[in-house]
Structures are given as C-alpha cells and as structure tokens.
Amino acid sequence: MDHATDWAGAVRAAWRAGRDTAPDPVALGLADADRHVLAEPLVTRTDLPAFPTSSVDGWAVRGEGPWRVTGQVLAGAQPPPLDADGDCVEIATGAMVPAGTTAIVRVEESTTGGDGRVTGRPRDKREWREPGEEAAAGEALAPAGSPVTPALVGLAAACGYDELLVRRRPRAEVLVFGDELRSAGLPGQGRVRDALGPQVPAWLRRLGADVDGPAVGPGTDTLEGHLRAISLARDKGADLICTTGGTMRGPVDHLHPALAELGTTYVVDTAAVRPGFPMLLATLPAAGRRTCLVAGLPGNPQSAVVALVTLVTPALAGWLGRPPPDPRALPQVRLGAGIPGRGRDTHLALVRRDPDGTAHPLPHTGSAMLRGLARAAGFAVIVPGSDARAGDVVPMVPLPLFPWEAS
C-alpha cells in the first residue's frame, strides 16, 4: 500500500476532480431551480421590503385625530402622500404606507363617527415594515454552493429574481458486480444478498446526485461485463459512475483492466484509510468533450461507505461548487471510550452520539458488516500512528442521515 494517497490528500484530490469535470452553470427559471445548487451568491437586488408596508389593516394617519378620511390604499397600489395633519387613508395589510404617515391605527381599535371622521389611539409600536428591514440592497443572503430549496426560491422571488444561475445535480449510475450476489430473497448456498445496490443510490441522492432508478446488476463478473456496463452508463450521459466490488488487482478482479482499456486516468488509486481498502476515483473521457467520474467502491458494505465518504462526497461537493473540504473544520467530538489506530492508515471508526454529544465506538463494525453503520452518526477520525483514548477530542465525519445534511 505504499502507493496509497493519504486520507486528507485523497479528499482534496477528489474535490478538485469534481470541480474540474463539472459543466458550466446554467440559468433556470425559479420554477425549475428547486433541488439544484446556487452557482453564485444570492444577493438582494433591492431593499427587502422595497418600500414601507403596513403590517395590519387599519388607518394610516397624519398628526393628531380625529382624522378625515381622504382615500383608501390597497396592496399593489402606490398612494399619494398624506399632506396635511388630520388626514388619513384606509390601509390594507401589505399595502404601501403613504409618505407623511405618522402612525397606523388598527381597524379593530378605531371608531368611525357619524361625520365620517376616524378616532382611535395608535399603539406605541410602529405598525409597518421599513425598507431594508429584512435585507438591504446588495446584501448576500446565501452563498454559492447553497442547495436551492423551496424557501430559497421564494426568497429569490421576493428579491426580484426571475431566474437563478445554478449548477445542475450530477447524474449518477450505480453498477453492482459480483457473481456471489443475490438481488432478492434469503442468502444461502454460497450466495449473499446485495446490500450495496439498494443503499448506494440512496446515499448518492442525499449527497446531491440524481440517480434514475435502482442500481444496475449484479452484472457479469468478467472483463467483458465490466466494459459493457461502464460504457453503457457513460454513453447514457452519466456524470458519475459508482461501481461496487473488484477494486483489488487479483486474477478475478476486472475493474482496473476495464478502466485501462477504456482510457481512464486515475485521480486516486486507493487511499490510506481503514476500512475502505482498496478504493479508486478516475476520470473517463466521454462524447462531446465531456468527462465523467468513475468511483470504484469495495465490495464490502462498510468499506464501500468509507469510499463514498472519502472520494464521492468531496467529488460531488466540487462538482456542485461547494467549498473545498477541510478536515480541520470537521466537528469535534469527545470519545466515551478508546479507539485503536490502524498503523500508517487513517482509521474511520463508526460512532454513535449521546444527547450530550459524547461519541461512543460501535460494535459490529467489520468491513463486511452493516449493523454498526445502521446506528452510526458518523466516523471518528483517528490519525495515522496513534490510538485514541476515552476523553480525547477527535474530528468526526458526520453521515448524511437526512437529505441535504451533507451541505
């Protein structure tokens, strides 16, 4: 494993590969921008609100009462100013407050006399929103790399946007290989259930990719089968191809020979991290001067998820214009028990978290196991050449337990 890239270096290289293979941003109308990612900061184009707006139904008054009614202001209209003390206009919630207004009297706290004049007592609190109260013109409200949510679409509309410059979500394909895999029913007779085909697409969606349909496979565990499946995914327009299994270089491991025949270039040819050995990330030329990414995930389930965390998560962050990952910026957790190191490799150890934030190593965390992963909040990072003791504070890579949580 002397050629392996250190874990932090692999994360950085994967981010750069995602950034460098991403297409140019596109402008989409607000109705189509949901679930994409901002390619530039969302900056207000006007004060928000752009003009003073009434917070209540009532009377916009000038001076002391009683007040003479000179008109009505509804939302959407631009009223003339109140020029004289003793004048007022009826005003609706959301309507523009006339210039010259000194107070607004709530309708339920007013009386209209027989002579048509309005009396009442304004509250001490101002009953309208001032321009710029929510945001001033030119203020940055969301940075580039932010996921576009329904709420952000609404904010953009309120700020005067008709379209947003976004990075589209990458299209991903998952290819499962392994003659020993069974896609349905109980394991037995030398065959095991495919645990990656159902879960990897779900991880990818939570990390910001679009995956149409289930994983493809289990595919034929031959060189021809690998060439055919990878070529088909590339030609269908996949931006990211995740394969499972076959990442070793043994006589029955066909991924590396297939990638060589297809003309790929390695970004990371395994990383010095355990579990997760071996993993890879490569670039694959595609039609139209396009380049897609190929992530080779180990066949053991927990190792595959470590490969997702190490290579796919940062690659997608780079693609989507999110900031480069900084392992030093990871959340810090205090360990409730010791975790042994893994020699020269970084150890990503599954942990759960107590309500007080203490992280506890989980049992059932062998490379082929899923029980610990199903309970985990993330991976504690144990640096090479060290053991962690109870009470130590270490970085943690959180798992994206809910959509967009990786943002």
Residues covered by each model-derived region:
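Flexible glycine/proline-rich
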Residues: 24-26, 30-31, 53, 258-407
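Short, hydrophobic/aliphatic alpha-helical segments
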Residues: 34-47, 78-90, 136, 281-286, ...
